[in-house]
A protein has these predicted regions:
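Midchain, well-structured core segments that form catalytic/ion-binding scaffolds
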Residues: 1-106, 133-135, 140
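Soluble non-cytosolic domains of exported or imported proteins
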Residues: 10, 108, 175-178
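His/Asp/Glu-rich mid-to-C-terminal helical/loop segments that flank catalytic regions of hydrolases
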Residues: 15, 25, 29, 76-80, ...
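Structural motif
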Residues: 56, 146-148, 167
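Short, small-residue-rich loop/turn micro-motifs
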Residues: 57, 63, 153-159
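Residue-level signal for inorganic ion chemistry
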Residues: 61, 114, 142, 184
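Short, low-order "capping/linker" segments at domain edges
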Residues: 104-121
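C-terminal hydrophobic structural anchor segments
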Residues: 116-119, 126-157
């Protein structure tokens, strides 16, 4: 279509913009707020000319959730919301929803075993609660099948500037390897005696 006659075609760029701007907000109204839904768009592609309305477009993004129930329901919810958003715009879509790993759900007994083992292996003030991350973690697949607990091992030496894990400037203090071995050994022994 031509931009001088948008009423004669489906304005695909407008449709993509509608999904981009409305989907994240609508998900927060459909999902339990404790799921902490984080939808972020990483790529949008459609058309090249300023005066032509393209026929096709691609939108790519990620949806991260903090609880399993919401993670299980998300695909159907995303499909339904896109359908509702695009219906008045007369736009069709194909959804290629690829589930990543589920959210990490630590089991309480395993978590307490590891916490106690860490206090013994390292020291009492070396153990801190960490905020749940929206990053994908493959260990979640194991926790789906077997009770367990995921912990983060601090690897900052306290001297060099602290940077994000994914930064090109990230340097792990290799002394953390020995601390990790002590932690896992104490955790394993505690589990055997539990």
């Amino acid at each position: 279509g031509h931009t001088s006659r948008p009423h004669l075609t489906t304005d695909l760029v407008y449709a993509l913009g509608t999904v981009i701007t409305q989907m994240p907000a609508l998900l927060t109204r459909k999902l339990d707020p404790r799921a902490a839904a984080v939808m972020v768009w990483g790529a949008v592609q459609s058309g090249e000319a300023a005066n032509a309305i393209p026929r096709e477009g691609v939108l790519r993004g990620t949806l991260r959730l903090m609880d399993r129930r919401s993670w299980d329901a998300a695909e159907g919810m995303v499909r339904d919301l896109i359908t509702q958003l695009l219906a008045p715009l007369d736009a069709r879509f194909e959804l290629d929803y690829r589930r990543g790993v589920p959210p990490v759900m630590n089991e309480a007994v395993s978590t307490e075993l590891m916490r106690t083992a860490a206090q013994r292996a390292l020291c009492a003030n070396a153990v801190r609660d960490a905020e749940q991350s929206t990053g994908a973690e493959d260990f979640a697949v194991f926790l789906d099948r077997v009770p367990g607990s995921l912990a983060r091992l601090g690897v900052w030496d306290g001297i060099i500037p602290r940077v994000d894990l994914h930064s090109s400037q990230f340097v792990a203090d290799e002394r953390a390897v020995a601390a990790g071995v002590r932690l896992m050994t104490h955790t394993m022994l505690a589990a055997l005696h539990h």
